[in-house]
């Protein structure tokens, strides 16, 4: 039996083909009625709080690691101190896993303007919802990093405020490429983990969806921390840059917006028009109307 064939057993032991799967309708580009819905504002608040918590935990982890490995502060034990790059990657991936699990049923658990942008391009969310989500995510990120500075004021500026910047020895093109590829991996994983066709077939998939998303964030951090400090989330990069507010994070800040947005757009196109055969369906519809 092909994997696209679904067979059910009848009461008399016979078999018959199940109904064909139907994709949900695309979200409207502009849904004015949505502005009067409490569910929209509840989702926006959830995105704000989730992004605030994400930035607070992760940036605090980065600052703590740099302090623990600072030879001038920790002495001879500095080389063996701290959680290491592996621990930082786990902090980012683990928090995404937790927060997506907590907020998926309310807002979809985006916590990232690049994810929201990719889902908007795929017509999964309306323009109104996408814009409000992105604003909430950016404000939440700024507030989250602000809390880190308030609680760790002695170390925040000294250790770079957890801000993203291009590492020495790497060109802007390399940094941009790292952000594009890293965000592609993340957004592609989001599309695959939340694919309604897969969810319709396997009832356990919605419960497990946060796991591959968090793991994708973890793996991307391992690969790109040495290059850009790993952005793949424009709100994360903006929040740290605004609160730290030094020249270095702002010099190449455009990389942490252009890279993730391009990566998200490529992932949306790949999933919708290649894997889900959107281009073939559109071509077939065009031919049938010709």
UniProtKB/Swiss-Prot annotation:
A motif (NPA 1) lies at residues 112-114. Induction: Expressed in roots with a circadian rhythm showing an increase at the end of the night period, a peak during the first part of the light period and then a decrease. The chain crosses the membrane at residues 43-63, 80-100, 131-151, 173-193, 205-225, 255-275. It is a multi-pass membrane protein. One of its GO terms (biological process) is protein heterotetramerization. Expressed in roots. Keywords: Cell membrane, Membrane, Repeat, Transmembrane, Transmembrane helix, Transport. One of its GO terms (cellular component) is membrane. Its main location: membrane. Residues 1-20 are annotated as: Disordered. A motif (NPA 2) lies at residues 233-235. Signal peptide: none annotated. It comes from the Eukaryota. InterPro entries: Aquaporin-like, Aquaporin_transptr, MIP, MIP_CS. The keyword RNA-binding does not apply. The keyword Transport applies. Homomers. Can interact with PIP1-2 to form heteromers. Belongs to the MIP/aquaporin (TC 1.A.8) family. PIP (TC 1.A.8.11) subfamily. Water channel required to facilitate the transport of water across cell membrane. Active as homomers. Increased activity when heteromerization with PIP1-2. Aquaporins contain two tandem repeats each containing three membrane-spanning domains and a pore-forming loop with the signature motif Asn-Pro-Ala (NPA). This is Aquaporin PIP2-1. It comes from Zea mays. The gene is PIP2-1.
């Amino acid at each position: 039996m092909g994997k696209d064939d679904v067979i059910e057993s009848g009461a008399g032991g016979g078999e018959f083909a199940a109904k064909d799967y139907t994709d949900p309708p695309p979200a409207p580009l502009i849904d004015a009625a949505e502005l009067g819905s409490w569910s929209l504002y509840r989702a926006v608040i959830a995105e704000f709080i989730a992004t605030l918590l994400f930035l607070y935990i992760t940036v605090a982890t980065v600052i703590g690691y740099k302090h623990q490995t600072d030879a001038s502060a920790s002495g001879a034990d500095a080389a063996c101190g701290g959680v290491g790059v592996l621990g930082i990657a786990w902090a980012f991936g683990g928090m995404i896993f937790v927060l997506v699990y907590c907020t998926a049923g309310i807002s979809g658990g985006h916590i990232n303007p690049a994810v929201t942008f990719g889902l908007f391009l795929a017509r999964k969310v309306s323009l109104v919802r996408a814009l409000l989500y992105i604003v909430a995510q950016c404000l939440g990120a700024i507030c989250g990093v602000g809390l880190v500075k308030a609680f760790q004021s002695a170390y925040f500026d000294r250790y770079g405020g957890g801000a993203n910047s291009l590492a020495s020895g790497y060109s802007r093109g390399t940094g941009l490429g790292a952000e594009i590829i890293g965000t592609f991996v993340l957004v592609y994983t989001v599309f695959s983990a939340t694919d309604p066709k897969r969810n319709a077939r396997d009832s356990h998939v919605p419960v497990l969806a946060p796991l591959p998303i968090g793991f994708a964030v973890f793996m991307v951090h391992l690969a790109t921390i040495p290059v850009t400090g790993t952005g793949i989330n424009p709100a994360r990069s903006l929040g740290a840059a605004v609160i730290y507010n030094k020249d270095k994070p702002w010099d190449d800040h455009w990389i942490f917006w252009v890279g993730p947005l391009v990566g998200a757009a490529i992932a949306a196109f790949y999933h919708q028009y290649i894997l889900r055969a959107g281009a073939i369906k559109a071509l077939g519809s065009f031919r049938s109307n010709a």
